[in-house]
Amino acid sequence: MIRAEGVCKSFDKKEVLTDIDAVFEPGKVNLIIGKSGSGKTVLLKSLIGLHSIDKGKIFYNDRDITVMNNKQIKDIRKELGVVFQGGALFDSLSVLENVKFPLNLFSSMTEKEKTERAIFCLNRVNLNNVENLYPAEISGGMKKRVAIARAIVLQPKYLFCDEP
């Protein structure tokens, strides 16, 4: 379970998150709805350890991530799939290399196993035979599906989607 308690975050003295409490359980769908600029992305990035918070606590399976070092947070991140708003694909990597990227960071699979897993995930999002193309060569919708394939390649316990 991921739990936020009293989370506050400011940028340049402008409070973006004010006393946020939330619980996210594996297998459950949660929506965070708000106006543009209301802090949805900041909350997501805080929940996965990409943003520090000013006040409050964020727990992952009852472990306080707000006091963890980068290595400890990295160990947790392999259980979190994230699709960022812009997709965050690497333009210099092929579709296949983009999807394999988390496997290269977090997996001890062989290169053949990584390729098979990445192609399996591409097929899950209905992207067949595009693995050798580059992000500039595919449509915006296809880029979003590549980002989803990359987010699920590690079989995460949680999948966060920012503006899916």
Question: What name fits each language-model region?
Answer:
Residues 93-101:
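Short coil-to-helix segment of the ABC ATPase nucleotide-binding domain corresponding to the Q-loop/switch region
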Residues 134-138, 142:
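Conserved ABC ATPase signature
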Residues 153-157, 163:
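A short, proline-enriched helix->beta-strand linker immediately N-terminal to the Walker B motif
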